[in-house]
């Protein structure tokens, strides 16, 4: 990498890097995109499960949302390359350190490509 490229790289904002990551994920060849809804049961609310899921999803480069449900469960809707989505599903089986996951249900849905980020959803909407 040349000096000019390094200098440009250092000047890039996180949002630009994030946008490049989004494009990279969407452009991956030979990857099948899937959509999975995940329901996580156990001690999963009040233990930073949503924020930890958002961080893990962003790290993996998958898109969708995570939210608490009124019944004490956490729901995740995720889209992206199959291998990366499967890695997030596997992560949900243990979650963050304070969580105690007892059961994970997953159901595959038709991929829509509607998301361009991964967000924490709250009662008032996505944040």
Residue ranges, per PLM feature:
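Intrinsically disordered, low-complexity, mixed-charge
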Residues: 2-127
């Amino acid at each position: 990498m040349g000096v000019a490229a390094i200098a440009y790289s250092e000047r890039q904002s996180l949002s630009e890097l994030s946008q490049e990551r989004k494009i990279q994920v969407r452009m991956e060849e030979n990857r099948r995109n899937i959509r999975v809804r995940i329901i996580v049961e156990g001690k999963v609310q009040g233990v930073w499960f949503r924020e930890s899921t958002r961080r893990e999803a962003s790290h993996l480069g998958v898109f969708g949302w995570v939210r608490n449900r009124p019944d004490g469960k956490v729901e995740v809707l995720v889209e992206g390359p199959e291998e990366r989505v499967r890695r997030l599903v596997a992560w949900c089986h243990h979650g963050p350190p304070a969580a105690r996951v007892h059961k994970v249900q997953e159901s595959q849905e038709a991929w829509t490509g509607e998301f361009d980020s991964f967000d924490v959803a709250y009662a008032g909407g996505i944040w």
